[in-house]
């Protein structure tokens, strides 16, 4: 455990270093700490011995280590003030007409990346917590059709497919009937289970050749089990991390899993400093903020950046964007669930 003065010294070094990215010496702290330069140097040496500070190669000053940043986040981090220009730009960015949920999620991800200069990712409600509330098949021609799936009565998913060659005219209706009878209204995990257990038995009753029918079921429904994730600012990872992290950002399902694992069920926000079990994220900071998607559940907004980021500003920005996002989604879903009449 460190003393109050040592904690103040660490906090000041973190603040100064994240602003200048230059090592901090005892003289720079003397006017901010009511102690002699020798006492400050002593405390800095103790903090270094504890692994919270480290020496710079080109200076006698000290800079925070990954452990030092982590200690700061866990014990001293509080929200900083938002620059008025930043706030104006954020509010202005959310003043647009959204035609679908993805428009809002993508805008939030882009704004977080643009204002921080780092990588941002945003996730919809976890697939396992969604329900299949609608299903239809629209035949486009004699050879292809479009499956329209609806999740949580508001999120559509379309899948175009070639009609199997051995299908008769009634077979699409039979397939639609099976879905309506066995899968509609069920949560996605139950749908997944039934596709593996119950549906193959049902299909045998209605189809002579079942292999291509089961393949078609898999093809139509596979999208239900994928995370909806938008990532902005991927190229920035080359500046603060490296090629491995940059390449990992393209593996969106793995990234989504890492983000979900960073936050427990009870937490509304977390800051993970060089502490991810995923090797590609092991040396970066991951900030995650949980936001409400009305009538459906919670989404996650994440910021991925360097360990030496400006935490006060970054945490404040993700909080403000999260709040603006919640307001925008509330208005969007209120409109979807209202009676809409155009009066001329």
Swiss-Prot record:
By its UniProt entry, which InterPro entries does this protein fall under? GAF-like_dom_sf (IPR029016), HrcA (IPR002571), HrcA_C (IPR021153), WH-like_DNA-bd_sf (IPR036388), WH_DNA-bd_sf (IPR036390), WHTH_HrcA_DNA-bd (IPR005104), WHTH_transcript_rep_HrcA_IDD (IPR023120)
Record keywords = Repressor, Stress response, Transcription, Transcription regulation
Q: Which domain of life is it from?
A: Bacteria
The protein's matches in Pfam families, at most eight in alphabetical order, are given as: HrcA, HrcA_DNA-bdg
What Gene Ontology molecular function terms does this protein carry?
DNA binding
Q: Which GO terms describe its biological process?
A: negative regulation of DNA-templated transcription
> Is Mitochondrion one of the keywords?
no
What this chain does, per the entry, is described as: Negative regulator of class I heat shock genes (grpE-dnaK-dnaJ and groELS operons). Prevents heat-shock induction of these operons.
Its family remark reads:
Belongs to the HrcA family.
From the Swiss-Prot or TrEMBL record, give the protein name.
Heat-inducible transcription repressor HrcA
The species is Streptococcus equi subsp. zooepidemicus (strain H70)
Q: Which gene encodes it?
A: hrcA
